[in-house]
From Swiss-Prot:
Keyword Coiled coil: yes
Protein's recorded name: Chaperone protein ClpB
Subcellular location, record wording: Cytoplasm
UniProt similarity note: Belongs to the ClpA/ClpB family.
Disulfide partners: none
Keywords of this entry: ATP-binding, Chaperone, Coiled coil, Cytoplasm, Nucleotide-binding, Repeat, Stress response
High-level lineage: Bacteria, Bacillati, Actinomycetota, Actinomycetes, Mycobacteriales
Organism, as annotated: Corynebacterium efficiens (strain DSM 44549 / YS-314 / AJ 12310 / JCM 11189 / NBRC 100395)
Region called C-terminal, residue ranges: 757-852
Stretch list, region Linker: 343-548
């Protein structure tokens, strides 16, 4: 056996046979051990050869394993290294001879299989008994390896290379496993034109992610199957090449190149009958290159592309095409670009209508046409970082999935009843242990109540199961209908018109009638527990879940809340009616849908002296909209006093440190597009900083340092300033005109002047500040009571027209907070006490004491 040259797979099989014989306690390795080993290999060629010979490899493997299990077992030290017996050696010799006849340099696993079948062993008898004779196996070689010779140690990776490393899209289209492609006729026609050229017949589809590049190729596969293509493409096979699986497991240098070459040779050998598709085309640049080798996949296919021997359709995004393909001009010139643009909202609705039935069948729900329109419109308006039709399809898919989950989950009424029944059952167990008369009477009543609740529960469960069964029936019928339609198309292509007539005029109308009856039963049910229809409201809920933007119809409670927005804001911001009304009107316009959808919800410049409530109003708006005053983007403009600091807002430009981190403003709004943005103390910033806000105020968009467009159309922009504070309204406006450029002022929705606070208004602020202090003390279970005289004292002493309400906060802190802290530390006041604050010593100070 010195001249025996096994391939890598054959060596692995021989090693596996040795290990199995050793583990089984067999004293020698027999042909059956080898047969089990070669059929058990994951990527082996022996199993496909048996299949080609008309034999089931799984049956042979199971029978061979039985033979191995029946061999005599021995014990001793030489069991760790059993030797091949005479029959096994004969099989190896026969396979070496056959390899020589075939012109192979190495013995591959399928040749070893033929060698086993040629011998006289129990394994050979098993193969012959199942029809896998030596001649049958030799004849099957042709279908697996063709005319290829084994000239390397890993030839198995090259046999049936196309089958291993590609997906036949035309086969999937024939089986009806590809979604229909709606529209895109122009792009498909252009692809067909390029493919029909004599040389450089290689179109590359370029477009943004999610616009439907791969779908165009799937549409081409469907057209090839339907025969709706020119003569040059009729009957051709369209395959999708999987470079990932080609690279995966290529352990040795040159192994990837061998696999790719085998694929390319098979494609060349098909004489133009195969059209190849590579998704993510940029991956061919650099794929397989290692160390000093420059021979990557891109360089290997260049000659074939230039000569027209390989018809290749590629798909990649604009950025990746520029980054990888355009750099290699020799590769780029071999491709013809086909630009795939984003479809319009109207075209997207058409695409969704074409896909609707597939999603209805998959999820077992109905999808309203108005829901498809809503998905296209809402995704276009609110999900700006992605592209149609992908984002609209995702919306419909998730909305249907959400509905299906609700159908499969137990309804709320049943959950509530089950909780009641469980509680009553626990009470019943507890009461059975009691012996007094009252407990026995209570037990009687409880058992009666429990019986009623159980009856109600079983009725509800039966109703739910019935409704669910009808919905499941519709789903089953629709799946059946889709299968019949696919079968009908296949029969029509094959010319079996009798079968077509039977399906189209018999079984399909019958099923459609059943579906209509079942859907009528669902629709006609009163007080239905389950909803099985995707409506625009469900789509809007999904949009809200994705973006945080309330896109759905307003509930009654929200309508009342919006109508009374001034009252809510007025509780926190005292004496600024004009400002509160301006902001409230902007929010109402946006939620009612009458605002300009291409501008921010509102943009305001708040002017006024310090401490009158400018920043407080921005916090109040955030609390009103998001139930949290901190849920806003706050930019302190005093940090942007230098010209270059604008880069902090939108992110550093390319080449600078921190380029990939994004800007403080743009990143915050990208993460949360529905928010309040507060630019505090704008007069402190450098004037050039406001130039970047011009596009935000006018078009609701801003481009960040990485070239991404950030959507500001659902934000409220509030700028605060105390320019001209202390002067008249006219003086304030003059100061604004001096500080800001006219084009900036002109883009604001409103400039709101805050009035100085009067002493009466300060009395209301005293109430607000004291209630905030009381809230902080509630953690220690302290109850705070401030007398009217003390409140008046605070309002008088805390009033300063130049500084607004801030001196009052300091006064409360000093007059009440400091004393209270000392009393708590001294133990005079303990947790849970009532605290009284009153005027003392003829109004000289406030006294804080425990109320008895």
């Amino acid at each position: 056996m010195s001249s025996f040259n096994p391939t890598t797979k054959t060596s692995e099989a021989m090693q596996a046979a040795l290990q199995q014989a050793s583990a089984n306690g067999n004293p020698d390795i027999r042909p059956a051990h080898l047969l089990v080993a070669i059929l058990d290999q994951a990527d082996g060629v022996a199993a496909p050869v048996l299949t080609a010979a008309g034999v089931d490899p799984k049956t042979i493997l199971a029978e061979a394993q039985k033979l191995v299990d029946g061999y005599p077992k021995a014990s001793g030290s030489n069991l760790a290294n059993p030797n091949f017996n005479r029959d096994a050696l004969n099989a190896l010799t026969a396979s070496q001879e056959l390899a020589g006849e075939l012109g192979d340099e190495y013995v591959s696993t399928e040749v070893l299989l033929a060698g086993i079948a040629r011998g006289k062993s129990d394994a050979a008898d098993l193969l012959k008994g199942k029809g896998a004779t030596y001649d049958a196996i030799k004849a099957a070689f042709q279908s697996v390896r063709g005319s290829q010779k084994v000239t390397s140690q890993d030839p198995e990776g090259q046999f049936q290379a196309l089958e291993k490393y590609s997906t036949d899209l035309t086969k999937l289209a024939r089986e009806g496993k590809i979604d229909p492609v709606i529209g895109r006729d122009q792009e498909i026609r252009r692809v067909v034109q390029v493919l029909s050229r004599r040389t450089k017949n290689n179109p590359v589809l370029i477009g943004e992610p999610g616009v439907g590049k791969t779908a165009i190729v799937e549409g081409l596969a469907r057209r090839i199957v339907a025969g709706d293509v020119p003569e040059s493409l009729k009957g051709k096979t369209l395959i999708s090449l999987d470079l990932g699986s080609m690279v995966a497991g290529a352990k040795y240098r040159g192994e990837f190149e061998e696999r790719l070459k085998a694929v390319l040779d098979e494609i060349k050998g098909a004489n133009g009958e195969i059209v190849t598709f590579i998704d993510e085309l940029h991956t061919i640049v650099g794929a397989g290159a290692s160390g000093e080798s420059a021979m990557d996949a891109g360089n290997m296919i260049k000659p074939l592309l230039a000569r027209g021997e390989l018809r290749l359709v590629g798909a990649t995004t604009l950025n990746e095409y520029r980054k990888y393909i355009e750099k290699d001009t020799a590769l780029e010139r071999r491709f013809q670009q086909v630009y795939v643009g984003e479809p319009s909202v109207e075209d997207t609705v058409g695409i969704l209508r074409g896909l609707k039935e597939r999603y209805e069948v998959h999820h077992g729900v109905r999808i309203q046409d108005s829901a498809l329109v809503a998905a296209a419109e809402l995704s276009h308006r609110y999900i700006t970082s992605r592209f149609l039709p992908d984002k609209a399809i995702d919306l419909v898919d998730e909305a249907a999935s959400r509905l299906r989950m609700e159908i499969d989950s137990s309804p709320q009424e049943i959950d509530e009843l089950e909780r009641i029944v469980r509680r009553l059952e626990i009470e019943e167990v507890a009461l059975t242990k009691e012996t007094d008369v009252a407990s026995r009477e209570r037990l009687e009543r409880l058992r009666s109540e429990l019986a009623d609740e159980r009856e109600k529960l079983s009725e509800l469960k039966a109703r739910w199961q019935n409704e669910k069964a009808v919905i499941d029936d519709v789903r089953k019928f629709k799946e059946e209908l889709e299968a019949l339609r696919s079968e009908s198309d296949i029969a029509e292509r094959e010319g079996d018109y009798g079968r077509v007539a039977e399906l189209r005029y018999g079984r399909i109308p019958e099923l459609e009638k059943k579906i209509a009856e079942a859907e009528e039963k669902i629709g006609g049910a009163d007080n239905s527990m389950l909803t099985e229809e995707v409506t625009p409201e469900v789509i809007a809920e999904v949009v809200s879940a994705w973006t945080g933007i309330p896109a759905g119809k307003m509930m009654q409670g929200e309508t009342e809340k919006l109508l009374n927005m001034e009252r809510f804001l007025g509780k926190r911001v005292v004496g600024q009616h004009e400002a509160v009304t301006a902001v409230s009107d902007a929010v109402r316009r946006s939620r009612a849908g009458v605002a300009d959808p291409n501008r921010p919800t509102g943009s305001f410049l708040f002017l006024g002296p310090t401490g009158v409530g400018k920043t407080e109003l921005a916090k109040a708006v955030s609390e009103f909209l998001f139930d949290d005053e901190r849920a806003m983007v706050r930019i302190d403009m005093s940090e942007y006093s230098e010209k270059h600091s604008v880069a902090r807002l939108v992110g550093a430009p390319p080449g600078y440190v921190g380029y990939d981190q994004g800007g403080q403003l743009t990143e915050a709004v990208r993460r949360r597009p529905y928010t309040t943005v507060l630019f505090d103390e704008v007069e402190k910033a450098h004037p050039d900083v406001f130039d970047i806000l011009l596009q935000v105020l006018d078009d609701g968009r801003l481009t960040d340092g990485q070239g991404r467009t950030v959507d500001f159309r659902n934000t409220i922009l509030i700028l605060t300033s105390n320019l001209g504070a202390g002067g008249t309204r006219e003086q304030m406006m003059d100061a604004v005109k001096m500080a800001f450029k006219p084009e900036f002022i002109n883009r604001l929705d409103d400039i709101v002047v805050f009035d100085p606070l009067s002493q009466e208004q300060l009395a209301s602020i005293v109430e607000i500040q004291i209630s905030q202090l009381a809230e902080r003390l509630s953690d220690r279970r302290l109850t705070l009571r401030v007398s009217d005289a003390a409140k008046l004292w605070l309002a008088e002493r805390g009033y300063d027209p130049a500084y607004g309400a801030r001196p009052l906060r300091r006064l409360i802190q000093q007059a009440i907070g400091d004393q209270l802290a000392k009393e708590l530390l001294a133990g005079e006041i303990r947790d849970g006490d009532r605290v009284l604050v009153d005027v003392a010593d003829g109004g000289q100070y406030l006294a804080v004491s425990r109320e008895h």
